[in-house]
Regions:
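Iron-sulfur cluster-binding cysteine motifs and their immediate structural context
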Residues: 109, 115, 119-136, 140-142, ...
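FMN-binding flavodoxin-like domain, especially the glycine-rich phosphate-binding loop
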Residues: 1-100, 159-178
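Acidic, Ser/Thr-rich low-complexity intrinsically disordered segments
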Residues: 84-126, 130
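Residues that cap or flank secondary-structure elements
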Residues: 6-7, 102, 112, 139
Length: 179
């Protein structure tokens, strides 16, 4: 699992269960820090060289265990997290610790910067940005930030006050590097 320097919550246990439902068996699990989708500050510059060494060592250990004991010998991998029903979704709060609802927040477009290249629509994992008019969000936005981070002209941004307050809280609390 990769997470943005806050927490991976039940991500690994959920992934293990999804794999099992599809007939796959987990042979190892780890969580690594990567740049958070909301911010270039949270987990910025990660994974770094040290992270990559740790990941490579982890992968080598898994391969060695499989080569020595065979895939059939692998037992159930115990992972952190709350078994189904999982612990629920992360509850966003603002800087005053009040609960905020950012589900309907969508990216805005600075028309003075946008040249209509459509890269934001191509990068949108949900297909939420209209390909013919990339200023329009016509589907469900999951706030992954791909449109913002990949826009070559810096035209995409979030301006919702609750979202920005939540982002400020995350950057205040979770900027220190985690290993």
């Amino acid at each position: 699992a990769v997470y943005g320097n806050r927490a991976y919550d039940d991500g690994i246990i959920e992934l293990r269960e999804i794999m099992a439902e599809d007939g796959l068996r987990l042979v190892g699990a780890a969580a690594f820090v990567g740049e958070h989708t909301f911010s270039r500050i949270l987990g910025g510059g990660r994974p770094d060289g040290e992270d990559l060494v740790i990941a490579e060592e982890f992968a080598s250990e898994i391969v060695q265990n499989l080569l020595l004991s065979g895939a059939g010998a692998a037992g159930r991998v115990e992972v952190p997290g709350t078994p189904y029903p999982y612990s629920g979704f992360y509850k966003a709060t603002d800087t005053s610790k009040k609960s905020v609802d950012i589900r309907k927040v969508v990216p805005q477009t600075d028309l003075t910067k946008c040249d209509g290249c459509g890269l934001c629509a191509k990068m949108c994992a949900m297909g939420a940005i209209d390909f013919t008019d990339c200023t329009q969000v016509v589907g469900k936005c999951i706030k992954c930030g791909a449109c913002i981070k990949r826009c070559p002209r810096g035209a995409k941004y979030f301006d919702d006050p609750q979202y920005l307050s939540h982002l400020a809280l995350l950057e205040e609390k979770f900027t220190s590097p985690r290993r």
